[in-house]
Curated annotation (Swiss-Prot):
Lineage: Eukaryota, Metazoa, Chordata, Craniata, Vertebrata
GO biological process: cellular homeostasis; mitochondrial outer membrane permeabilization; mitochondrion transport along microtubule
Gene behind the chain: Rhot2
Domain remark from Swiss-Prot or TrEMBL: The Miro 2 domain is necessary for efficient ubiquitination by PRKN.
Identification of the protein by name: Mitochondrial Rho GTPase 2
Database matches in Pfam families: EF_assoc_1, EF_assoc_2, Ras
Ranges for domain EF-hand: 184-219, 304-339
Species assigned in the record: Mus musculus
KW Chaperone (keyword) present: no
Length: 620
């Protein structure tokens, strides 16, 4: 909604434009009237809509044509004033003033116009019969107000209607010639209806209507008011109420009725509560609320966010089979501007026979929140999170984690979403590794590996806690890029156990990107089902890891009758959760060994101290 309103008064000389302004401000009819009033600013706290309002007068005798066009360009609404006792001033509305205001606007939005019949004290009766044909000819005319500056009649109402024409315009909502909602308005209201229909039975129950009413207007409807609404709809729309529930047709009819009766602010209140702008598009402020993410921090859905997206899953799982079919997923996206998740979803999260189970669905939301929180905020906005959850914005569904360096200092992370970069030469099996994390086999896939997504996500358990682990495949060619972002919670360096050259490549990556840092690293020997290749001169993988105090290389193979072991994924998640255990301390035996060494060291020190004591005693 606009932050201020600029009203311009136009009309023939002596129709009372200046008198209207001065009567409004002074609350009395002025005895002496200047040729033109200075611009008046009415503070927000004294206007009905709580918006600052600027009122601008015009004098044909004092201002040029260029100055007039400049004022028209700056105005938000124009009041064309005529003298009810002078028919020639009414005719000038059609022939002069409206062409001046909107004559140069062949297409696009036109300035709203309020017709103002002044000096109603000089003529009995009304001029509405003479004005109605003009209103029918020019749809930009919002309304007509008859008033008297001398008797202070309808002065406040005139400026209220002018404000209303700007803040709650009719033109984007309603086509007066067709006497129906404009397509963009009907589409926006249809989306709002679908969001409010929580049980997806194609009707709003009394409970859903009251929730909608409370969300938009701050209070529920009285039981009698609910019945009155449904009675009006039943009387006017066939099928507007079915099974005592308001249907989409009934909902659209009610909003049409509001507009036809001059209560279009009611429809605008609904639209703006659900994030729409004056152009009937979701505003950037609604879709992308402010969310500060400092460097080194990540973003996750919090409990409110997970509860909401799970609620959306259950709402659209119409057959209650625990998965979203392609049709059910399409229904979920019907309130979006377009389907955000494509066929790559099948190779990104765990799926079930081409359908999306709740587990995979939550994984996808988690991945999106981590990789692109702005997109996540927009998706939550499309689903109506702020309205349906009665929150200020969807930013309240997001948690920003503490900085990674603090995790490293404390030796443990509180993050529930962990990032693992998978690096290695081309052809070592990175794509197969990512798909194995989902329980998929590349052998069964129709697409070549290069067409697979670069991210997969699943859950693993670390010390009894569930963690989301994201595997991110780093393209082999991008490793030559000095600006490559290798930041992660754990690095997986993959080499082909049958091709020693690929290990040399991994060792180079480790030395370049990770050797001097604190990121845990795990070397993985892929294709463990193949014979081991002849190692070139130099350190073997096991010796290299031992020298650099890294865990021993883990073996991995996608071939065989059984699914690949998930132990390696658990190991990666554990290393990411406890980043201070960068070296071999991750193995249970090393904890025991370290304890033994400490105990032995203590015993040796005690023996040496006792022996030294005996020598000193004897020397005395």
């Amino acid at each position: 909604m606009r932050r201020d309103v600029r009203i311009l008064l136009l009309g023939e000389a002596q129709v009372g434009k200046t008198s209207l302004i001065l009567s409004l401000v002074g609350e009395e009819f002025p005895e002496e009237v200047p040729a033109r009033a200075e611009e008046i600013t009415i503070p927000a706290d004294v206007t009905p809509e709580k918006v600052p309002t600027h009122i601008v007068d015009y004098s044909e005798a004092e201002q040029t044509e260029e100055e007039l066009q400049e004022e028209i360009h700056k105005a938000n609404v124009v009041c064309v004033v005529y003298d009810v006792s002078e028919e020639t001033t009414i005719e000038k509305i059609r022939t002069k003033w409206i062409p001046l205001v909107n004559g140069r606007t062949a297409t696009g939005p036109r300035l709203p116009i309020i017709l103002v019949g002044n000096k109603s004290d000089l003529r009995p009766g009304s001029t509405m019969e003479a004005v109605l044909p003009i209103m029918s000819q020019f749809p930009e005319i919002e309304t007509c107000v008859e008033c008297s500056a001398k008797h202070l009649r309808n002065i406040s109402e005139l400026f209220y209607y002018a404000q209303k024409a700007v803040l709650h315009p009719t033109a984007p909502l309603y086509d007066p010639e067709a006497k129906q909602l404009r397509p963009a308005c009907a589409q926006a209201l249809t989306r709002i209806f679908r969001l409010s229909d929580q049980d997806r039975d194609h009707g709003l129950s009394d409970e859903e209507l009251n929730a909608f009413q409370k969300s938009c207007f701050g209070h529920p409807l009285a039981p009698q008011a609910l019945e009155d609404v449904k009675r009006v709809v039943c009387k006017n729309v066939s099928g507007g109420v079915q099974n005592d529930r308001l249907t989409l047709e009934g909902f659209l009819f009610l909003n049409t009725l509001f507009i036809q009766r001059g209560r279009h602010e009611t429809t605008w209140t609904i639209l703006r509560r659900f994030g729409y702008s004056d152009s009937l598009e979701l505003t950037p402020d609604y879709l992308y609320p402010a969310l500060h993410v400092p460097p080194g921090c990540s973003t996750e859905l919090n409990h409110r966010g997970y509860q909401f997206v799970q609620r959306m899953f259950e709402k659209h799982d119409q057959d209650h089979d625990g998965v979203l079919s392609p049709t059910e997923l399409q229904n979920l996206f019907s309130v979006f501007s377009g389907a955000p998740w494509g066929p790559e979803l099948l190779h990104t999260v765990p799926t079930q026979a081409g359908c999306l189970p709740l587990h995979g669905y939550l994984c996808q939301w988690t991945l999106m929140t981590y990789l692109d929180v702005q997109q996540c905020l927009a998706h939550l906005g499309y689903l109506g999170y702020p309205t349906l959850c009665e929150q200020d914005s969807q930013a309240q569904a997001i948690t920003v984690t503490r900085e990674k360096k603090l995790d490293q200092e404390k030796g443990q992370t509180q993050r529930s979403v962990l990032m693992c970069k998978v690096l290695g030469a081309r052809g070592v099996g990175k794509s197969a590794f990512l798909q194995a994390f989902l329980g998929n086999s590349l052998g069964e896939a129709r697409d070549p590996p290069e067409k697979f997504p670069l991210h997969t996500i699943n859950t693993v358990r670390v010390n009894g806690q569930e963690k989301y682990l994201i595997l991110c495949e780093v393209n082999a060619d991008s490793l030559l890029d000095t600006s490559l972002d290798t930041t992660c919670d754990v690095a997986c360096l993959m080499f082909d156990s049958s091709d020693p050259k690929t290990f040399v490549h991994c060792a180079t990556i480790y030395k370049r990107y990770y050797m001097d840092g604190q990121t845990p690293c795990l070397f993985i020997a892929s294709k463990a089902d193949l014979p081991e290749g002849v190692a070139p001169p130099g350190l073997s993988p096991a010796e290299f890891c031992r020298r650099h105090r890294l865990p021993a290389p883990a073996s991995f193979s996608c071939l065989g009758p059984a699914m690949p072991s998930t132990d390696v994924f658990t190991q990666l998640a554990t290393m990411a959760t406890f980043p201070h255990l960068v070296h071999t301390e991750l193995h249970p035996t090393s904890f025991w060994l370290r304890g033994v060494l400490v105990a032995v060291g203590t015993a040796v020190a005690a023996v040496l101290s006792f022996s030294l004591y005996r020598v000193l005693v004897k020397s005395r």
